[in-house]
Amino acid sequence: SDNISFSEALLKLTDAEIDFKDDRARKINVQISSFPYQKTINDFDFNYQPQINKSAIEDLCSLRFMETKSNVVFMGTPGVGKTHLAISIGIEAATQRLSTYFINFSTLMAKIKKAIAEKREETIIKHYLKYSLLIIDEIGYLPIDKETSYVFFQLIAARYEKRSTILTTNQPFSKWGDVFGDNVIASAIIDRLVHHCEIIKISGLSYRLKGRNIFDNDEN
């Protein structure tokens, strides 16, 4: 018979409600993670960047690195897909309902500078320590002062072996002394980051120039 008992119907309804609430919670978690856009690994064109090991990226999307509190650094010139890949991993983490937060490096530095002025350094470190996965995008576009660099180091040191951090940068580690205004602080930051870290170097062409030849002479 197609008839089901009242208790079975109620159970199915309850399961459906749980699924709905779980799905809604996942979507909310993605929304509050502050991603500038939502792109997954399936949206990434690995054919355009063939030097990237796709299986290595897929492994990062499995979030195994978070189990060991390891970090990820995407390093390469502007436009090669560093931010896209970082967001892909972040969306996977947020979908798994792991506390995730995305922030641009310059925005974070501005917040740290404000915290220093208001003598709230410990508060801001605790705030960004709480996320299971913190994604810091675009290190290296603007140099920062030594005092701000030191608070950033304290944040990285606080997260070391406790939480996972993903960073994207257009500068090799050898130039981080210039970025952070101090070679000693830069070395200390790098030391904490790379001890347990997957470093992905991307040297391909910019996606933003895909299909365009900016060196063509435009004679009007």
Language-model features and meaning:
Residues 1-37:
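Interdomain "pre-motor" coupling segment immediately N-terminal to P-loop NTPase/helicase cores
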Residues 82:
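Conserved lysine of the Walker
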Residues 85, 89:
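Hydrophobic positions on the alpha1 helix immediately C-terminal to the Walker A/P-loop
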Residues 79:
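Walker A (P-loop) phosphate-binding loop of P-loop NTPases
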Residues 90-103:
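Post-Walker A helix-loop "phosphate-sensing" segment adjacent to the P-loop in P-loop NTPases
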